[in-house]
Amino acid sequence: MALHWLFPTPVLQVDLEPDAATAAAMQQQLEQFDAQVYQHPEFSDRNNLTGDLLGHAGLDQLHRMDAFQWLNGQLAEHVSAYLRSLLGPEHGLMAHNQKAWPVVCARNGGTVDLHSHRNAQLSAVFYVLTDPANESGELEFEAPDDYFSHVMAIPYRDAAVSGGVFAPLPHRLLLFPSDLRHRVLPYEGNGPRYSVSYDLAITTAPGKGCEMRTPHPMDWVPLGS
């Protein structure tokens, strides 16, 4: 008897190598965010800080900061390779940064709840600083449960025979479809756990819109203008 697991999901993993100055600049920005936000009483009892949820001006715009320009370039290179691998060299698509934000997990079991990014097509996470001796705080992807009835629910860990849990190693980049549900498992490291998340929109080139693909924003017209 053979049991076949169908519908693989492409997740790109690459371990980047920033030079010392670039790595230090990114870490400094995340340290400032950590110190400035966690000192506020309303956030002191949280087990995570995510810049897209806190509502502080500019905290979802890290991709505009000088410290993250190297990372932007690396992300562009690997998004291009990801799309070429899936669609071929003539796919004609363009990637756009929607937003990028910092994530800080507390050392005593910090987590991020299960979620997806419905506003984007591709999402990415880059680990700026983690405890290399402690691989807790993994990113876990959850398989879609649409294929099983509610009376025959299969636990995710039993169904995920092909993996789905990624260790947060320093300078690791992960790229994945934004609709893929994911969460951060409890982090128990001795040092800070800093990462940057990106949401990307994938569109056609300007003037190249076609059925079932999102046209370039330059081709949009505000309703009522």
Each language-model region and where it sits:
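Active-site region of the double-stranded beta-helix
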Residues: 69-98, 107-121, 128-133
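Catalytic core of non-heme Fe(II) oxygenases with the double-stranded beta-helix
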Residues: 102-175, 202, 206-211
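Short beta-strand His + acidic residue motifs that chelate non-heme Fe in jelly-roll/DSBH
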Residues: 112-115, 182-189
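Non-heme Fe(II)/2-oxoglutarate
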Residues: 1-89, 111, 193-195, 199-225
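Hydrophobic residues positioned within well-ordered beta-strands of beta-sheet architectures
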Residues: 12, 98-100, 122-124, 194-198
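Short conserved micro-motifs at the rims of enzyme active sites and ligand-binding pockets
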Residues: 25, 187, 207-210
